[in-house]
């Protein structure tokens, strides 16, 4: 039985291969792991979930969606998550397992808020849960270099 320590010896490429992750348009790699069969307005899944990995040098570029997104830290280095609800003030949350230093295992991005993220080490594996479910037609990627 593993105690989780082996996760630190894996490389980003190992995790991408083991979880069958694919490149994401915002940056990083992902794979959808859950799509609720319950449907809500517009024939949309009630919720969805993905694995999401950012490696050193990758960034989840500024983007927003029309639904609430919950980030869950799973493994690797801490992750810096930036959120802007008013295109000016940026809130920075560090996701990770060092609770005493202020890191948190999860964070919520409100619907329509801008968000961006980057790993603070070699790689970070997170989960993202979206409700109502994620649809690319409700995804807006900011121009490269843009910041609120």
Could you say what each language-model-derived stretch is?
Residues 2-108, 116-117, 121-124, 128-148:
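Non-catalytic, conserved peripheral segments adjacent to functional cores
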């Amino acid at each position: 039985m593993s105690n989780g320590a082996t996760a630190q010896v894996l490389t980003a490429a190992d995790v991408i291969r083991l979880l069958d992750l694919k490149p994401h348009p915002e940056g990083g790699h992902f794979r959808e792991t859950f799509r609720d069969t319950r449907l809500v307005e517009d024939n949309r899944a009630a919720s969805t979930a993905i694995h999401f990995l950012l490696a050193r040098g990758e960034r989840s570029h500024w983007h927003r969606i029309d639904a609430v997104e919950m980030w869950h830290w799973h493994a690797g280095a801490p992750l810096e998550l930036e959120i802007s609800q008013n295109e000016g003030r940026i809130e920075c949350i560090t996701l990770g397992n060092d609770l005493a230093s202020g890191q948190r295992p999860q964070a919520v991005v409100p619907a329509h808020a801008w968000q961006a993220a980057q790993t603070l080490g070699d790689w970070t594996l997170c989960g993202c849960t979206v409700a109502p479910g994620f649809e690319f037609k409700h995804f807006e990627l900011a121009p490269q270099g843009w910041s609120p």
